[in-house]
């Protein structure tokens, strides 16, 4: 049957509409072009803004800040919500980096594709506003970037201080090369300086079928080279979810620098539109001002006067310089952010005045100070250079420990080296060390609630050291004198002078047996390997000490050695374990909590490492998340004093008093009220 002609267009229209409905939404091509950014609709944060002449300025020269600019709407990179197939995309942009010096800049910038425009957790400096030290490389970042980096950062395995890299979820590039391009005529590689203050054009192309990323760059006046600078297969489907935002990120460090984008184009499933070079705004260029004739006359006279004045001041200056001289070596550049100037520490402690002296530890004196710039209270420990390991390795370990961040750890802020001394800078703890609170007659007796909170806090800090940080940190000297109390009487584990670091999943190395008698696990006498289990043993002794108000090893009235673990175990066998709680509490304690602490302390003190609970279990027991198994006193059938003698610790007791450690006490990093 033939339809009447008037109805034919309507039928055809319905047919095309029906076919159009079958076309997936993901096939819609996204395309935009910005020849300059005047009036451009972009999303900004940080320092990013558009200048009066249309430049997208990501950073304005302010130190240690970041800037981001994004196309405001998310783009669909996967071909459909239930598909992992990726769409191809292409982008072209012109950038420029203007530093204070032609051959030196302050970190770089990056083209980015991100799941979210919110990068508030990212850090400036070497992190370029993309990630931070904790999440660098995490798959949950969902971040793809092409970086233009002007600083060599060894922590990211950078190849040079002038390179281009392809980044996935972090700043350890999956592919990188020195900035430059391949000449189409000769095939020779032409170097480019990212900090030349000249505009550079960049093309980034991704093939959704082959998963190949090509990055090409050239000076603005050079046509696009045929051979890309970088070419890498990258499975972006595992990085980018269905939709993502495209834009730019940059950050500054300690030097003056501005990062600019002059123009930008983007297209999904096709070549990015060519930018109109003649329409792009110009980069600011700093030219030296012509010297005036007046300056030519005045300058020689002023120079002569200045030389005389400088000569008069040199003697005073040199004396002050010698006074505040420090020992610095080239390898310490890596640890720069963790280094304090001796001058600041000198003024902070009033010239290391005796009035500021908190105490004298095993390695040196400890002073209370107030940093002149931040007014923060600190404890400064002056340590003599030891020979137990190379200074470079020692400083590296100090800096590594300085990166620990937990509310129940004393923060190591940094260090300074000078004339045979190493100065360590810590947070100041106003309420002193726990052992002083437990044993000093003039102190008010700690309430049970305070003791239980301190025990749980130190356990939380120990879990962070053992399992939650990037490396395993074995403390090796857990005891009451190494637990400091902040202004709110929260316990913070400190003194990492004996601590050892090793990677998760590896075995600790054999070392000299060091620590404090009464806290040393029995197996250390024959294995020499400090481990998480030996730390748990020391923590068990610590729990008993806090609950009972007695030292792990002491002398009775008849000069007999009394081991706290054995005494508590005897009382448990007699059915009176809570009778061991500190009598100064006069019975004012929660019996269930005290029983838990005492029984858990005994369980941690088991002579077999495998019978002790893991650190996470220990925290779960103390927090009440998991009940402590019902154990009879016969399960702990041992005599700790006999075990210590069997393991050969008696000579060690003679060398290291029971109330001190081979590394000196950390309690001097605090002061009582």
Swiss-Prot record:
Its EC number is 2.7.11.1. Residues 318-673 are cytoplasmic. Residues 32-270 are annotated as: Legume-lectin like. Residues 28-296 are extracellular. It is a single-pass type I membrane protein. Glycans are attached at residues 41, 60, 82, 118, 138, 191, 214, 235, 276. GO terms for biological process: defense response to bacterium; defense response to oomycetes; negative regulation of response to salt stress; protein phosphorylation. Induction: Induced by salt stress. Keywords: ATP-binding, Cell membrane, Glycoprotein, Kinase, Lectin, Membrane, Nucleotide-binding, Receptor, Serine/threonine-protein kinase, Signal, Transferase, Transmembrane, Transmembrane helix. One of its GO terms (cellular component) is plasma membrane. It is found in: Cell membrane. CDD domains: lectin_legume_LecRK_Arcelin_ConA, STKc_IRAK. Residues 352-631 form the Protein kinase domain. The active site is at residue 477. It comes from the Eukaryota. The chain crosses the membrane at residues 297-317. In the C-terminal section; belongs to the protein kinase superfamily. Ser/Thr protein kinase family. Lectin-domain containing receptor kinase involved in salt stress response. Acts as a negative regulator of salt tolerance. This is L-type lectin-domain containing receptor kinase SIT2. It comes from Oryza sativa subsp. japonica (Rice).
């Amino acid at each position: 049957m033939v339809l009447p002609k008037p109805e034919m267009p309507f039928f055809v229209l319905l047919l095309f509409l029906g076919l159009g409905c079958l076309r997936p939404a993901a096939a819609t091509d996204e395309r935009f072009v910005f020849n300059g950014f005047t009036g451009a609709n972009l999303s900004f944060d940080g320092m990013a803004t558009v200048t009066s002449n249309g430049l997208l300025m990501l950073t304005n020269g302010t130190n240690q800040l970041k800037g981001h600019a994004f196309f405001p709407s998310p783009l669909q990179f996967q071909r459909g919500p239930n598909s992992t197939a990726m769409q191809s995309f292409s982008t072209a942009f012109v950038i420029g980096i203007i530093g204070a010096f032609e051959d030196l800049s302050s970190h770089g910038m990056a083209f980015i594709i991100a799941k979210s425009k919110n990068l508030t957790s990212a850090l400036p400096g070497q992190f370029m506003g993309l990630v931070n030290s904790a999440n660098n490389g995490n798959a949950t970042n969902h971040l793809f970037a092409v970086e233009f980096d002007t600083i060599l950062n060894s922590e990211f395995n950078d190849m040079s201080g002038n390179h281009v890299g392809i980044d996935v979820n972090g700043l350890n590039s999956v592919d990188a090369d020195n900035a430059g391009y391949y000449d189409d005529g000769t095939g020779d590689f032409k170097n480019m300086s990212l900090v030349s203050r000249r505009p550079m054009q960049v093309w980034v192309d991704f093939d959704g079928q082959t998963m190949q990323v090509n990055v090409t760059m050239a000076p603005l006046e050079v046509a696009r080279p045929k051979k890309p600078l970088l070419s890498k297969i990258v499975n972006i489907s595992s990085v980018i979810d269905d939709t993502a935002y495209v834009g730019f990120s940059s950050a500054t460090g300690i030097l003056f620098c501005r990062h600019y984008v002059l123009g930008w184009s983007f297209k999904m499933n096709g070549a990015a539109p060519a930018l109109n070079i003649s329409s792009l705004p110009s980069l600011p260029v700093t030219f030296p001002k012509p010297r005036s004739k007046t300056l030519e006359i005045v300058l020689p006279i002023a120079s002569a006067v200045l030389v005389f004045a400088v000569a008069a001041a040199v003697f005073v200056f040199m004396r002050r310089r010698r006074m505040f001289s420090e020992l610095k070596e080239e390898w310490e550049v890596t640890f720069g952010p963790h280094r304090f100037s001796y001058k600041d520490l000198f003024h902070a402690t009033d010239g290391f005045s005796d009035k500021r002296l908190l105490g004298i530890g095993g390695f040196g004196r400890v002073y209370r100070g107030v940093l002149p710039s931040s007014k923060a209270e600190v404890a400064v420990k002056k340590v003599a250079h030891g020979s137990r390991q190379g200074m470079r390795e020692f400083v590296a370990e100090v800096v590594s420990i300085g990166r620990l961040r937990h509310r129940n750890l004393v923060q190591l802020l940094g260090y300074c080296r000078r004339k045979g001394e190493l100065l360590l800078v810590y947070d100041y703890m106003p309420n002193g060390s726990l052992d002083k609170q437990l044993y000093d007659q003039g102190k008010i007796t700690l309430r049970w609630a305070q003791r239980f909170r301190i025990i749980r806090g130190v356990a939380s800090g120990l879990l962070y050291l053992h399992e939650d940080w990037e490396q395993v940190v074995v403390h090796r000297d857990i005891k009451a004198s190494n637990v400091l109390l902040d202004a709110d009487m929260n316990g913070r584990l400190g003194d990492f002078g004996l601590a050892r670091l090793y990677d998760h999943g590896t075995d600790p190395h054999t070392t000299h047996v060091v620590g404090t008698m009464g806290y040393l696990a029995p197996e250390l006498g024959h294995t020499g390997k400090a481990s998480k289990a030996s730390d748990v043993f020391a923590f068990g002794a610590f729990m008993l000490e806090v609950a009972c108000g007695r030292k792990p090893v002491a002398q009775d009235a008849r000069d007999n050695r009394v081991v706290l673990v054995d005494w508590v175990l005897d009382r448990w066998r007699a059915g009176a374990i809570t009778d061991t709680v500190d009598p100064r509490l006069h019975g004012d304690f929660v019996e269930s909590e005290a029983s838990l602490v005492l029984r858990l302390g005994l369980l941690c003190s088991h002579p077999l490492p495998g019978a002790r609970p893991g650190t996470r279990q220990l925290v779960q027991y103390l927090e009440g998340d998991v009940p402590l198994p019902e154990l009879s006193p016969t399960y702990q059938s041992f005599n700790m004093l006999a075990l210590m003698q069997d393991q050969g610790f008696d000579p060690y007791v003679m060398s290291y008093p029971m109330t001190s450690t081979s590394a000196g006490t950390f309690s001097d990093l605090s002061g009582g009220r």
